[in-house]
Amino acid sequence: MNRPTAYVGIHADVYGGMTDIGRMIRDAWVFGILPETETCEGWELPKFDTLYGQVHAAWDPYGHMVSQLPADLRARHERIYDTAVKRARELGWSPDLDDDEDE
């Protein structure tokens, strides 16, 4: 079976990017690592290793907790994630879907 080697882009990803890669892209938007117009469509999967390191380093000073973000970043995070959750729900996503993996 041929597996795709390039990412489809956050908007074409499962439920509009409710995946680990989608969350990483949104976090990169929050921290200004990527512009919000960057969907990462066509990125080769290994390129995400570099992005992961950058996003992880950006979260470190805040203990990887939204509540520890300064007000401007917290507001940006809320706006980006609220939009993503709204879109995902329109596409049929439910937070309970993530729990199905444990069953």
Report each predicted region and the residues it spans.
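N-terminal acidic leader/helix
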Residues: 6-50
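A generic signature of intrinsically disordered, low-complexity regions enriched in glycine/proline
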Residues: 17, 31, 76, 81, ...
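Amphipathic protein-protein interaction modules
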Residues: 39-92, 96
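Short intrinsically disordered terminal tails
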Residues: 1-3, 93-103
